[in-house]
Amino acid sequence: MTKLKDFSKTLTFWLVLINIAVYIAVLINPTLICYLWSYNLLYNSSIEIWRFVTPVFTHAQLYHLVANLLSLVYLGSLVERYLTKTEFLCVYLGTGIISEIATFIAYSWFSPNAVGLGASGAIYGLMGFFITTVVDKKDRFKILIVVIISAVGINLFIPNIGNIAHFAGLFSGLVFGHIFMKYCKHEKANKFLEEYMIEVKNKF
């Protein structure tokens, strides 16, 4: 009960609620999704700016929502432990928006009938940020390769996966993490990183 109470105070908790609320709203009014997803320049010549943000909170299928929320709870809770709320929100929304912009541009050229939606880009952004800020330097490349192979491998089992969003989110997360470690690292982060390394060493 205490853990749930603590979790309810986090931004991750509120991001989960927003995703669920949007999914329920789309179930009630299916036409709403047409105003939330991103789509290419051929159909979106006016470039509706909100479509770079709303897809990050929009899911069409229940399995897509559940998979993303489980990942968000795990990664979000971990990354949020060593960032301020503002920093965490900047990483999550920043990488999510970058992934949607990349999807928007790519679909305009290569998949004119495709649409983009889902929190995956932002979640991969958190993953990239975590790899850069927490994982030991000598292990980063190996873990990055595993993540990339896994992302591509998912295509074999689940159709219509937005790999453009995944990779754009992942690599923007790596960049955000590098910037954080070089210019923004603070006492809260230092304390967490020290404690986390001790936890990892004790497990092995």
Where are these regions (language model features)?
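A detector for small-residue-rich transmembrane helices and their helix-helix packing motifs
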Residues: 1-204
